[in-house]
């Protein structure tokens, strides 16, 4: 009886071992040959990029497409603002600086913005300092070499909001 138990146990152990080898040989590491840059991580053979990076291997800063001199065409009601404005690198990979030419030289100082993928956001700020009577905030979306903007310039006192829309190319 002991001998039958030993044979049955050995057979079961052999089948289990063969099954484990067969299973692991069929499950290849999809990330084995994938190299993700800039702290990206590989999941199922595809790089998941860290914030601020994009591309197949996370090789490109997301803000790169925004960094240039743009020809701007903004509208506020019946008024058309046509001007040139530059966007440059900010302090980290998600930040950019918009030159003071923004909104046809409305502000004396630069404007800080953040980039997340194809979206550029101007968080609410007073570019000309706390003694200035004006604030700005807004969002733009990048597509096919253009940024479509909606931004608001707010006069603090007396209170008034001016919503601008525009296309930069």
Task: Give each language-model segment a name.
Residues 29-39:
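Disulfide-braced loops of extracellular cysteine-rich modules
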Residues 73-77, 114-169:
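Beta-sheet ligand-binding and adhesion/scaffold domains
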Residues 39-42, 83-91, 109-117, 137-144:
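Short, exposed beta-strand/loop patches in secreted or surface proteins that constitute
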Residues 1-26:
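Sec-dependent bacterial lipoprotein signal peptides
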Residues 62-82, 98-99:
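Tryptophan-anchored aromatic micro-motifs
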Residues 27-31, 58-67:
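Short domain-boundary/entry signatures in modular proteins, especially
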């Amino acid at each position: 009886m002991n001998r039958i138990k030993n044979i049955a146990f050995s057979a079961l152990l052999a089948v289990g071992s063969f099954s484990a080898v067969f299973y692991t040989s069929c499950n290849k590491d999809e990330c084995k040959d994938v190299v993700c840059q800039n702290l990206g991580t590989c999941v199922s053979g595809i790089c998941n990029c860290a914030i601020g990076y994009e591309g197949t291997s996370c090789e490109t800063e997301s803000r790169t497409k925004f960094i240039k001199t743009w020809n701007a065409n903004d509208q506020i009601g019946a008024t058309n603002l046509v001007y040139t404005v530059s966007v440059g690198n900010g302090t980290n990979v998600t930040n950019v600086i918009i030159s003071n030419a923004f909104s046809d030289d409305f502000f004396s100082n630069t404007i800080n913005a953040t980039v997340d993928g194809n979206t550029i956001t101007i968080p609410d700020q007073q570019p000309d300092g706390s003694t200035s009577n004006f604030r700005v905030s807004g969002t733009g979306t990048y597509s096919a070499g253009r940024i479509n903007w909606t931004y608001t310039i707010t006069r603090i006192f007396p209170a008034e909001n001016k919503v601008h829309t525009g296309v930069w190319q």
